Amino acid sequence: MAKYRRVVVKLSGRAIAGSAEFGFDSNALEHLAREIIAVRQSGVEVAIVVGGGNLFRGNQSDRWGIDRVEADNIGMLGTVINSLLLRGKLTALGEDNLRVMTAVPVPAVAEPYIRLRAVHLLEKGATVILACGNGQPFLTTDYPAVQRALELGADAVLAAKDGVDGVYDSDPKINPEAQRFSRLSYDEVISRGLRVMDQSAFILARDFGIPLHIFDIEQQGAMTAICRGEHRGTVIDTTGGKAGSAALASSAETVV
């Protein structure tokens, strides 16, 4: 039996790019689609907030010599491209109850995001793919992922990372002795200065107490395991580690 009834998956554009920094990777896309299908088949309702960093990043506006707001608009349209690509792959794999909803109207290819309609679609078994963030510039898709989770009554946010299996006490790519946290509280993340997601998104999650699961999307079955209540990656919630201290991961994963 699933632990969660409804989740929001935060999917970065980099996950779609696979081993490349930009563009698309067909193997990565198929892996993502099959992971989503597995979660749906477990009975969990799924909404997906898709990023666009594999196509364009608004924070690179200076590099291109364009206005930041214009750059963010381009980035939002990049999330539409990724959402349509994901929908196309899911359809090719046999999924037929799919909706792409956008915060910026693109009526020729998707429907506008309307909260109550999105909730209704989830209740009817649709996988809802959410594009364009929340339609506002100066934000990554971290904030809309938490925002949509709260709006849609999701039980948790699953932040899928590509090649990173949780939150560490230091950068594991630089420090081979870096240790991964199994559990953290919101306050522990702040006091330790750990980088989990954009601060505005993290504060929103903390204020409303929605659990965050930071995990490696490349690990097959990780999303489904999390939804069943098995531990993967790092869990951030109101309690954190036992006895008020952050819990470091052990060699064996445990049920949470």
From Swiss-Prot:
Sequence positions that bind UMP: 52, 72, 134-141
Catalytic activity: UMP + ATP = UDP + ADP
Keywords, ordered alphabetically: ATP-binding, Cytoplasm, Kinase, Nucleotide-binding, Pyrimidine biosynthesis, Transferase
Pathway per the UniProt entry: Pyrimidine metabolism; CTP biosynthesis via de novo pathway; UDP from UMP (UMPK route): step 1/1
EC code: 2.7.4.22
Primary localization: cytoplasm
MF (Gene Ontology): ATP binding; UMP kinase activity
The protein's name: Uridylate kinase
Organism: Frankia alni (strain DSM 45986 / CECT 9034 / ACN14a)
